[in-house]
Amino acid sequence: MVIETDLALPDGRTLHVYDTGGPARLTVFWHHGTPNLGAPPGPLLPLAESLGVRWVSHDRPGYGGSTHLPDRTVGNAAECVAAVADALGIGEFAVMGHSGGSSHALATAALLPGRVKAVAVLAAVAPFGAEGWFDGMAAASAASLRAAAEGRAVKEKHEATAEFDPAVFTKADFAALAGSWSWLDDVVRPALGAVGLIDDDLAYVTPWGGDPAAITAPTLLMHGADDRMIPATHSKWLASRIPGAELRLTPGDGHISVLDHAADALTWLAAQDSSASDATTGAM
């Protein structure tokens, strides 16, 4: 069961929080994609329970029940996570995300090195300005982000007339959307038209406010080798930047079908926590 609450922040804003609660061996903060609501990934709930994982997440500002925060950065996610963790009495935790949510997870790890124990991300977006950032991107995806790079007014004008282009997805993506990850429809539809979508894209093309090179936690980067929305070169760049990061490219997968490997990523997170616990015990 997922419990939903609203957290009042000191500046008067609200964060809408999701929490599976209960005793857990590891807490994982989920960072949602664009545009999504923040509910933890339904297809992974049974596995999480078997692994002893507690999911905690929130709607990013401008989505769902979370107050809009103009000009937020990707790094702002660390402030949100810290506020939620403090309110729930959680000290250390792992982070996980998909697509743009992966970037927010990585920034959280970079900015909260003393609290983030491990990182697993899928189809991550590299910081803007990374070499070849637009290379290999589907035309519609590139046009949307180029509009964001021109500023809010241009991005808003673009969104007013933009239509979905099926070329951004592969056959494997559509199969995942119709089957194993049809759950995404539950979190995407309520987020369409939200100001959070524009804020997200503006954040992706501005400095994060945190350097991936500062990440000290074990990090797993998974990316579909055939991703047309955010090409795998983004995760390759991140892997070259994050100390000790593990890169797994999944052949034949696109931006959505890479989620068929999310269970492996979650299992990997739990294993990192076990390894850290074993090392600590052995040192005592």
Predicted ranges, named:
Residues G244-M284:
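Catalytic active-site module of serine/aspartate enzymes centered on a nucleophile-bearing elbow/loop
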Residues G136-G210:
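Alpha/beta-hydrolase
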Residues G91-W133:
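Conserved hydrolase catalytic core segment
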Residues G33-P46:
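The serine-hydrolase catalytic nucleophile loop
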